[in-house]
């Protein structure tokens, strides 16, 4: 009869000892030239598009990924600061969020609106065209979803340690 105790699998050799320093990277630059190069990288290598692609959706996606990488740096630094200070956090759960479009707000919060405008101009694109290509990120159908979005946006503006949670659903509305 086999032994009834369950032995955990052995940890991989890479997980033993000190943690590998894979996240120690220089901060991403916010200047126009760096934004342009990262945009081109995401457009060509991540999305697999070339100069013949005229679909604004892919251009919007490349810009969103470029900005997301910069937001992730700030997000990780914020989490580390809250964790090291043992800050209490609030968690907000809602069945719906009507966040709306976020591109222009993200550009403003990162302080890269002018740099992005210049980078896109150098690539033959207009920021306004990409802003119009952004899909609406609404999840829900009413006032409570808008209230939830406003609450989280206010918390972010005030730099409060709040996370929002929701249900992701694919078919229909609540």
What name fits each language-model region?
Residues 2-174:
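A conserved ligand/cofactor-binding region detector
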